[in-house]
Amino acid sequence: MPASLRSPLAIILGAIPGALARYYATIFLAGLFGNDLPYATFLINFSGCVGMGLVVTLATQPALMSPDLRLLLAVGFLGSYTTFSTYALEVTSLWRMGQLGQGVLYGLGSLGIGTIGVLLGSLIARRLTI
């Protein structure tokens, strides 16, 4: 297989089961806990963050995980299972590099800008349908 196709293929092979895992986990957890609060999303985000921590830590040792497997799991599976795990990884990476202020700013800024983005998108959609 050409080297240029290895990375995209690894990501694709992880993304499909990641998306399906999120879908079925959401159905299962909503049935278990109800829909009063978004428990399913909360638990999926938490489990995705645990998974990201495991993958990224194991990937630092090439004997334990190949670069292709890291892409399949971290970018493909966990990326489609929950992007929150990537966000949390980026915040903790900034902290580990001694950039506490930037980590806090990025973390809070992402939450704020994400919320504003959803509100803005909703406003635009309402304007388009009027």
UniProtKB/Swiss-Prot annotation:
Activity regulation info: Na(+) is not transported, but it plays an essential structural role and its presence is essential for fluoride channel function.
Subcellular location: Cell inner membrane
Annotated GO CC locations: plasma membrane
Any Gene Ontology biological process: fluoride transmembrane transport
Reactions catalysed, as given in the entry: fluoride(in) = fluoride(out)
TM region positions: 9-29, 39-59, 71-91, 104-124
Family designation: Belongs to the fluoride channel Fluc/FEX (TC 1.A.43) family.
Name of the protein in its database record: Fluoride-specific ion channel FluC
